[in-house]
Amino acid sequence: RRGTAYSLLLQRVFTRRNFQSNCTPKLMPQANSYRIGHSPDPDDAFMFHAMTTGAINTGERSYEHVLLDIETLNKHAMNGDYEVSAVSIHSFPEISDKYHLMNCGASMGEGYGPMIISNREISLEDAKNLVFAIPGVGTSAYLALRLAMGDVKFEVVPFDDIMPAVQRGDYDVGVIIHEGQLTWKDEGVNLILDLGIWWNEKTGLPLPLGGNVVRKDLGMITCREITKDV
């Protein structure tokens, strides 16, 4: 994972004026123009930036960003709204009739993953009785939480508000993803469990978190060309 300073630099470079952030899908793009739905996480922005700025040769294909949180992207993918999208691996079985999973750009947690945090020292056993703030039921973070802790009470909170909500005391525990995994030590919260480490120790395997998908109705040739661009 990249350091915090690097992430802040990317956030300055990829300003939000370059992104389409409306949660309502736009009208269908022109021929050979494709929308890429991805999260505001800097590594996603970095991954797709070259495709949207002409930094690499994409032939006749052009791309535009659609900047949304991962749970919203999962929901849009259920409807097949965007031609290309980042999605949670947990949600992929639900959309596999509409999308191909690309063989590039996946997020695999090897020695890291979503983190369970609290605003005070709490044991893992005591945390099971509390209400968790989670980034969405379609996220791989929620699946990992369920695998590690079984049935727990939860409420869905935008991923970038989970840590502030825990700090405010709105929730005693939360599951953080994206930049929160890098900054939690500086935010004064307590780490209860790193779900990526838990999964690695349990299985010896990386934890599948996110992937990129391309819509099947574009045709196999176009899907392969877009995947090559990515």
Predicted segment positions?
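N-terminal hydrophobic or amphipathic helices and topogenic motifs
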Residues: R1, V13-Q20, T24-S107, S118, ...
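A structural signal for short, well-ordered beta-strand segments and their strand-loop junctions
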Residues: A77, A86, V156, G174-I176
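Active-site regions of enzymes building and remodeling cell-envelope glycoconjugates
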Residues: Y99-N103, V152-F154, V189-I192
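Short loop/helix-cap segments at secondary-structure boundaries that form the rim of catalytic
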Residues: E94-S96, L145, T183-D186
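Pocket-lining segment of extracytoplasmic ligand-binding domains
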Residues: F159-V230
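Hydrophobic/proline-rich hinge and linker segments of small-molecule sensing/allosteric domains
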Residues: L101-L124, W199-D217
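Bilobed "Venus flytrap"/periplasmic-binding protein-like clamshell domains
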Residues: A31-T53, Y112-D172, E179
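Intrinsically disordered, low-complexity segments enriched in serine/threonine/proline/glycine
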Residues: Y6-L8, S21-N22
